[in-house]
A protein has these predicted regions:
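Transmembrane alpha-helical segments and their membrane-water interfaces
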Residues: 82-138
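Alpha-helical transmembrane segments of multi-pass inner-membrane proteins
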Residues: 118-241
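Hydrophobic transmembrane alpha-helices and their immediate junctions
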Residues: 346-395, 432-433
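A membrane-periplasm/extracellular boundary helix in multi-pass inner-membrane enzymes
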Residues: 130, 134-139, 237-284, 298-302, ...
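Long extracytoplasmic/lumenal interhelical loops at the membrane interface
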Residues: 275-294, 298, 306-346, 365-373
Length: 434
């Protein structure tokens, strides 16, 4: 296959893979679990072949140690797990996502990855808004996935694919079937679309429209978590731009100012937490999250060091996980906090490994964002908007991690793997953008 066509094929495969990770619920809800799982196996097999062909690109120094340790520790947990069979069952999709992330990071040039990410997110947002419009205009009532039996009596609203709330101003769930996930994808889209507009890789009017649609989607989801994530991304963007405007030898006052602002905001949140929650329409229990956190903490304390074994998401038929998070008769399958989730599953060892891995990703991404591209004696190369992507996506993931467990499953884990592998070799980003 000619090089140009092969490059297009790799980008196309990445788009399909990312769509499955970002909006897999749409495929499951429309076609069923069997087809979705079959597609996952096929894509994994393709990426295994791709990785084998590109094995010469793998160097030990380019492997993020703590991320690899966390992944291997999760796999090894099957040996001491409370339920080895169920741990093995949930490890398979984790391994699939890891393989896909490694394949994308290893074989897709940085600019092609940004392009693939932008294309995927446009498809997800467009499909979500059109889907909600179709439900409101032509259906006129909430609809359920094909695998939900609506003849067996009243089905909880949480299982609805769309709640038919578009004309009421939301919250909408889009094709992903979850407003928090849709809102988070819109936050990532906002980052990618803004970078593409700044890089002039899309038409100005076209890019502006998509930025507007991403903001509209965030608003229609009414997700407090994602609004906070967007605010964190905006604050870090402002800080990076400030850093770039100051010579490297004079950045200490900027750091001190940033630390002071973080401390002030922490105190403000602590003192005015009730008022802040009221603004977002939340009660003191954070929509039931505090009860879930208490239950997960109590279970984690029984096996604090190595945990109960990997179970993400929790399996709904296994005691005691099936009754850990119950709200209005609905059994939720995550802790709504990735750090508590990992503590329960992999103990202190897993939490420490993940924390170090994320800190390494954050710190490497930070310096890639604030420093000029340099791989020789030339230190005058211009800054690029594209070098902001790893940092801003990482900030968004971390902001979400305290209210959701998405960081270690599906789209969240894929992004962590891709970005962690990429920032280990900064020139993959900097040389691609100059």
């Amino acid at each position: 296959m000619p090089a140009k066509e092969y490059r297009k094929a790799k980008t196309g495969l990445a788009v399909v893979t990312l769509f499955m990770l970002f909006a897999g619920e749409a495929i499951r809800n429309l076609l069923g679990w069997e087809i979705f799982m079959g597609m996952g196996v096929l894509i994994t097999a393709i990426y295994i072949v791709v990785i084998i062909r590109a094995r010469h690109l793998i160097h030990w120094r380019s492997i993020p140690f703590w991320l690899a340790f966390f992944a291997l520790f999760a796999v090894a947990s099957v040996t001491w797990a409370y339920s080895p069979a169920n741990t093995a069952l949930t490890l398979w999709p984790f391994i699939e996502v890891t393989i896909g992330g490694v394949g994308i990071a290893l074989t897709l040039p940085w600019n092609d990855f940004i392009r693939a990410l932008g294309t995927t997110l446009r498809w997800v947002l467009a499909a979500s808004l059109l889907f909600e419009l179709w439900v409101s205009v032509f259906i006129g009532h909430a609809i359920y996935p094909v695998w939900v039996d609506t003849t067996a009596g009243k089905v909880p609203a949480v299982y609805q694919w769309s709640r038919n709330l578009l004309f009421e101003g939301g919250p909408i769930q889009g094709v992903v079937g979850n407003r928090n996930q849709l809102g988070f994808l819109a936050v990532i889209a906002q980052i990618v679309f803004s970078i593409q507009l700044a890089q002039k890789t899309v038409w100005r009017n076209w890019g502006t429209v998509w930025i507007g649609l991403a903001l509209l989607t965030i608003g229609l989801t009414r997700s407090a978590t994602d609004i906070i994530a967007l605010a964190a991304v905006a604050a870090v963007t402002a800080l990076v731009l400030w850093m770039r405007s100051v010579p490297a030898t004079k950045r200490r006052p900027v750091y001190l100012t940033a630390y002071a602002v973080v401390i002030a905001l922490t105190v403000l949140v602590k003192v005015a937490s009730s008022a802040i929650l009221a603004v977002f329409g939340k009660g003191s229990d954070l929509t039931g999250r505090t009860d879930i956190w208490a239950a997960v903490t109590a279970l984690a304390e029984q096996r604090p060091v190595f945990g109960w074994g990997w179970l993400s998401p929790w399996v709904p038929w296994l005691e005691p996980f099936n009754n850990l998070a119950v709200r209005s008769g609905v059994h939720y399958l995550q802790a709504h906090n990735v750090w508590l989730d990992v503590w329960m599953q992999l103990g202190y060892v897993g939490v420490i490994a993940l924390a170090i891995a994320m800190f390494a990703l954050l710190s490497r991404s930070w310096f890639i964002a604030i420093d000029r591209p340099q791989w020789d004696l030339d230190d005058t190369r211009p800054y690029s908007a594209g070098s902001l992507l790893p940092l801003l996506v990482t900030v968004a993931l971390l902001a979400q991690s305290f209210a959701e467990s998405q960081l270690v499953v599906q789209s969240g884990w894929a992004l962590v793997v891709i970005l962690s592998l990429t920032v280990m070799v900064p020139t993959r980003i900097t040389k691609a953008l100059t």
